[in-house]
Amino acid sequence: MGGGDLNMKKSWHPLLMRNQEKVWKDEQAHKEEMKRVEQLRREIEEERQLLELHRLQEAAGGKKRKDRVEWMYAVPNTNGPNRDSSEMEEYLLGRRRLDDLLKDKIEDQNNSLEKTEFIALQNANSLQDTQAKLRLDPLLAIKQQEQKQLQTLMEKRKYSLDSDRKSKERRHRDRHHRSNQDRSRERSDNEQHSSDKREHSRRSYRNDRNNWRERTHNDRYRHRDKYDSGYFKKHYDDDMRFDQGHFQDERDLKKYVRTSRQYSRSPSPDFRTRNHQFHSRDSQPITQRHTDIESRLQKMQDNAKELDESRRKKIELLEKKERDEEQFLEKERRDTARKWDNQGDFIRNMRKEIYSGDSVSLADRVNSSRHNMLRP
C-alpha cells in the first residue's frame, strides 16, 4: 500500500495542474502587455515622423499649422435651454430674425436676474439663520463665559498688583515719615535736655545769688543791730572821731566810707568756691567718663593681645608635637625596614603568618627549621 509521491500533495509543487494554469495565465498576460507596449511605441514613432514631416513642409515654405486642442474650443449651449444647434443653423441660414434673438436674449437676462435675486434672498435668510444658530449655540455661550471669567481674573490680578505697589509706596512713605519724626523728636529731646540743663544751671545760679543776697542782707541787718546795740556804736564813734582827726578834709572821709561799703558788699570767698564747684560739677563726669572708656579700651586691647599670643603659642606647640610624631613614625619605619631587609608590608605579614601563625603546627615549624639547618 503505497502512498505515492508526497511532494505532489504540496501546494507549491510545479506539477500540480492549478500551478501550471497559473503560470500559463501569467505568461499570456505578459504577452498581451508586450503587444500593447509595442503598439504604443509604433504610434509614438508615427506621430514623431508626422511632426517631422510637418516641420519640413513649413521649412520648405508651406502653410504653418496651428497646434491646438480642438475640444477646448468647442462652444457649449450657453444661450438658454431652448437654444440648440438647429436654432443656430436656422439663424445662420436666414430663417430666424435678429430681433427675435435679441428678445430671447433679454428674456434670458431677466430670468437670470430673478434667479440671482432669489439666490440673494436665500443668502440673507441663511445669514439670519446662521446668526440665530450662533446665538443659540451652547458651545459659543460656554466660550464667551470662559472669556469673561478670564478677563475678570486678569482684572483682579492687575488690581492686586496695583494695590501691592501702592501699599509698598505707602509703607516706604510711612517709614520715611517715621524716621523723620524720630530724628525730629530726638533733636527736640536733645534741645529740650540742653534747654533744661541750661535752665537748671540758671535756676541754680539764681538761687545761689538770692541766697547770697539774703545772707548779705541778714549780715547787714545784723551789723546794723550790733551797731544799734551800743558797742559798735561806741567804737564806730571812736573810729569816726579818729578818722575825722586823721583825714584832713571831708572828701577823704567820704572816699573812705564808700570803699568800706564796697568791700562789705563783695561776695565772700566761700560763695566763690561753691560757685566754682557748681560750674565744674557738670564737666567733671564727662572727663571721668572719657577716662573710663579709654581705660576699658586699653584693657580690651591688652586682653586681645594676650589671647593672640596664647593662641600662637598653642599652635607652635601642636606643630612641634606633630613634627615629633612624624619623626618618630619615620624612624620606626626605617628600623622595621632595616630589620626585614627592606621588604614590603605584605611580604612581612605573609612571612609572619607562615612562620608564626595559628595555621602552622609545631611539626611544620620543626621540619622547616631542620630543613634550614641542613641547607649548605
UniProtKB/Swiss-Prot annotation:
The modification Phosphoserine is found at residues 266, 268. InterPro entries: CIR_N_dom, CWC25, CWC25_splicing_factor. The keyword Transcription regulation does not apply. GO terms for biological process: mRNA cis splicing, via spliceosome; mRNA splicing, via spliceosome. Keywords: Coiled coil, mRNA processing, mRNA splicing, Nucleus, Phosphoprotein, Spliceosome. It holds the Pfam family Cir_N. Residues 168-178 have a biased composition (Basic residues). GO terms for cellular component: cytoplasm; Prp19 complex; U2-type spliceosomal complex. Residues 154-167, 179-199 have a biased composition (Basic and acidic residues). Residues 153-211, 258-289 are annotated as: Disordered. Residues 25-60, 286-334 form a coiled coil. It is found in: Nucleus. Belongs to the 40S cdc5-associated complex (or cwf complex), a spliceosome sub-complex reminiscent of a late-stage spliceosome composed of the U2, U5 and U6 snRNAs and at least brr2, cdc5, cwf2/prp3, cwf3/syf1, cwf4/syf3, cwf5/ecm2, spp42/cwf6, cwf7/spf27, cwf8, cwf9, cwf10, cwf11, cwf12, prp45/cwf13, cwf14, cwf15, cwf16, cwf17, cwf18, cwf19, cwf20, cwf21, cwf22, cwf23, cwf24, cwf25, cwf26, cyp7/cwf27, cwf28, cwf29/ist3, lea1, msl1, prp5/cwf1, prp10, prp12/sap130, prp17, prp22, sap61, sap62, sap114, sap145, slu7, smb1, smd1, smd3, smf1, smg1 and syf2. Involved in mRNA splicing. PANTHER family: CELL CYCLE CONTROL PROTEIN CWF25 (PTHR16196), PRE-MRNA-SPLICING FACTOR CWC25 HOMOLOG (PTHR16196:SF0). Belongs to the CWC25 family. This is Pre-mRNA-splicing factor cwf25. It comes from Schizosaccharomyces pombe (strain 972 / ATCC 24843). The gene is cwf25.
